[in-house]
Amino acid sequence: ARRLGALDLDDASRVESIKTRSRRVLALYVAITLVAWAVLAVAFGDAEAGLLYALAAVATGGFAPSGDSLAGISGLAAALVLGICLVSAVSYDQWLRTRRSGWRGLVADPELRLLVGLCLGAGLLIALLQWWSGAGAGVGDAFAHAISAQTTAGFSTVATDAFSAPGQVVLIVMMLVGGDVGSTAGGFKLVRLLVLVAVLRVIWLRIAAGPRAVLPLERSGARIEQGELENAVALAVVMATALLAAWLVFLAHGVAPLAALFETASALGTAGLSAGVVGADLAPALTAVLTGLMWLGRVELFAVLILVLPKTWRR
């Protein structure tokens, strides 16, 4: 009985902790949205447009009042919208921890550093690829789409075909990686990418040092737990399998290989960028495939397993 009582107490404490965290995250989400609305209302000179762009940016949803997305607004307003997307692609738990650790703790966060580094590095790479190929999109477009793809926001300043084929491949990778765990961004998530990089690093070092070498599996100085590793590997396998299957379906319907890969990666990463294939006239089968990818990309593997495995329903 004592043991059962302890379990009940632990469960109650855990539930209360989840409730407290949820309230804090909700309050932070509302606060970020209100600040974003105020900033964008001034930038646009229109409170309604500011609100619509703020809601889409904080949610990294990418919906815009204008059919031109960010193409029809000023450079300053577009930069502010993308900046808000970056803020929302960072874990909300990290923003909450900043109250205790200060800005130094935020700057030291490895996921934040990786997010900013990927946006800057990919933007520069795409710009160089544009210059090399002579394609239509400029430097500003390269960085704007890099941020939009990495945060899975889906805002655009030019059509996707304005980028060279290698540039589109870079955007595909970014959409699949996505933002931070605990943020509004989709994708595989940065922390899981760091886990896989740590695994590859250990494998490489073990080859160099010999099979008897004892090499700890660590991420940012902290040991990677078995469950964390299994989570990352399992999700990577599921995402790769789903992406390949969906891509083959698109190819069977006559869609060009790169465009098919772009559309399926965008759906799986819940990014919303398009290569021009998706529209009102899209075949119902392809619409269903993209819908399934977006659902899988948003709820992720373990929520799907809970849904499809009856044994988990009673737990």
Language-model features, listed with the residues they occupy:
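Membrane-proximal intracellular helices of multi-pass ion channels
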Residues: A1-R315
